[in-house]
Amino acid sequence: MTSQQIPVRLDALPPFSPVVARLLEELNGEVQSFRRLSLRLSEDPALAAQVLRMANSALYGRRGEVSSLLVAVNLIGIDRLRALVLTYGVRQMFRPVARLPLARRIWRHSLATAILAADFAMDAGGDAMEDYTAGLLHDIGRLVFLVCAPE
C-alpha cells in the first residue's frame, strides 16, 4: 500500500450506522426518554434483538420473557445499553475483515480488555463505562490498519 492509497482506503471505512450514531449521541447526553430510545432501537432489528437477548439473559433473573424494547431498556439501564450499542457499532464497522483470524484475535482482545477495564474501574470506584470504552477502542488502530491493508 502506498502513502497515496491510505487516505482513499480510510475514506472507504464504513461509518457507524445512522441509528447507532444517533443512539450514542442520545446515550452520551442527558437521556430524555426511554420511549424514544426504544423507538430508535427498533430502527435496527439486529441491535434490537441483542438488547432483548440481554434483557432476557440470566443476569437479570426475570421469570417472564421480555419482548418489549421499552421494558428491556428500563431493565438494562443506560450504562449497559451504551456499552452494548458501542460494541455493536464498532463490530459493524469492521465487518469487512471480521473473518480474518487476526481481526478475530484483535476483537476478542479488545472486548476482553473492555470488560476487565470496566471491572477494575468498578472495584476502584472509577467510571466503568469510560474504562469499558477505552478498553474496547484501545487497539482500534490495528483494526483500521487491517481494513486498509488486509494484505
Where are these regions (language model features)?
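Conserved alpha-helical "signature site"
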Residues: 1-151
